[in-house]
Swiss-Prot record:
Pathway: Lipid metabolism; bile acid degradation. SUPFAM superfamilies: FAD/NAD(P)-binding domain, HI0933 insert domain-like. The keyword Oxidoreductase applies. One of its GO terms (molecular function) is oxidoreductase activity. Involved in the secondary bile acid metabolism. Catalyzes two subsequent reductions of the double bonds within the bile acid A/B rings of 3-oxochol-4,6-dien-24-oyl-CoA and 12alpha-hydroxy-3-oxochol-4,6-dien-24-oyl-CoA to yield 3-oxocholan-24-oyl-CoA and 12alpha-hydroxy-3-oxocholan-24-oyl-CoA, respectively. GO terms for biological process: bile acid catabolic process; lipid catabolic process. It catalyses: 3-oxocholan-24-oyl-CoA + NAD(+) = 3-oxochol-4-en-24-oyl-CoA + NADH + H(+); 3-oxochol-4-en-24-oyl-CoA + NAD(+) = 3-oxochol-4,6-dien-24-oyl-CoA + NADH + H(+); 12alpha-hydroxy-3-oxocholan-24-oyl-CoA + NAD(+) = 12alpha-hydroxy-3-oxochol-4-en-24-oyl-CoA + NADH + H(+); 12alpha-hydroxy-3-oxochol-4-en-24-oyl-CoA + NAD(+) = 12alpha-hydroxy-3-oxochola-4,6-dien-24-oyl-CoA + NADH + H(+). The keyword Transmembrane does not apply. Keywords: Bile acid catabolism, FAD, Flavoprotein, Lipid degradation, Lipid metabolism, NAD, Oxidoreductase, Steroid metabolism. InterPro entries: BaiN-like, BaiN-like_dom, BaiN-like_dom_sf, FAD/NAD-bd_sf. This is 3-dehydro-bile acid delta(4,6)-reductase. It holds the Pfam family HI0933_like. Its cofactor is FAD.
Amino acid sequence: MNRIGIIGGGASGIVAAIAAARSDGDAQVFILEQKENIGKKILATGNGRCNLTNEAMDASCYHGEDPEFARNVLKQFGYGETLEFFASLGLFTKSRGGYIYPRSDQAASVLELLEMELRRQKVKIYTGVRVEALKLSAKGFVIRADGQRFPADRVILACGGKASKSLGSDGSGYALARSMGHTLSPVVPALVQLKVKKHPFAKAAGVRTDAKVAALLGRQVLAEDTGEMQITAYGISGIPVFQISRHIAKGLYEGKEMKVRVDFLPEMEASQVRKAFNTHLDKCPYATCQEFLTGIFPKKLIPRLLELSHIRQNFPASELKPAQWEDLIRACKQTLLTIEDTNGFDNAQVCAGGVRTGEVYPDTLESRYADGLYLTGELLDVEGICGGYNLQWAWATGYLAGRAAAERP
């Protein structure tokens, strides 16, 4: 009998167990999960709605040392395969702007269907057990957890990374992978908020506004994204900030000075802003600078933009000199923020970095160093952007690894 041990009961581990059990009905499949319940992170995804995947599924939406690795995995288990898999569980889905959610809009529905299938497939689940070591023996593997020994012919490492420790990912999987001979690219927080040094917008905390943000290393733009940015007391947040955060985190890890350029009027070029301001001034010749900006920006943001421009709030807009107008336009379009840190692993949605993908076969997720060992999900040096891409990665790698583990001769 093929004994398949899965370390980690998150998204990729659960799907790996189902795929393994479906592929080999005689296999003895079991999951070891250190939290009291499996699938805790699934419940937190998509603000509790579980953004399963995305219609615009492309390898360019993933980052890592080897971009081709993600492409090869997704060719085998992509958007269509994910929908088919969840349909086989009985899940109805819907699209919201290309983002795929359960029709119920509840992540709990997704987890419950996965748990129902685990029971149907007679997968044994051990919760509240922390894996301490993984050893190779003459007869396969031995997993040590809380003083117990779990022998296995195949092992799937689905432990997750270090992001959101409260949901079960504490980085312990990296040590297990290392013990099997694997190496890691630097692991840093990704899809995370950024902390700003000498934060000029701290008093505007709570403001949400459309903006384009760009990650800068010197004059080089590493990445940029547009959307709703949130100003916090310590820095900046929101989806566009999350999308560029991995580049900032990598730079900070390497000891580089990292900046973010913020454009508060992304829908207009600077020349268009200049023209719009002139037209606006013709209509409001008696407005103070505070009043002039009232119809353009959120109230709490206006004093901060004027402060950056060295302009008094009650100064008549009609009396501003050309150089002052340019300072104001620069503040609106090209504010530079120096980033001192990310908001850490505990607040990150995922990690950038992990087990180097060159050490894993992309068609099976099997280790090149240890026969019968498979690595999935966030443990690998692949992470996606916001929008269902990281769950897609978990489903895909979990399914391929589970199937391969069951079918391996």
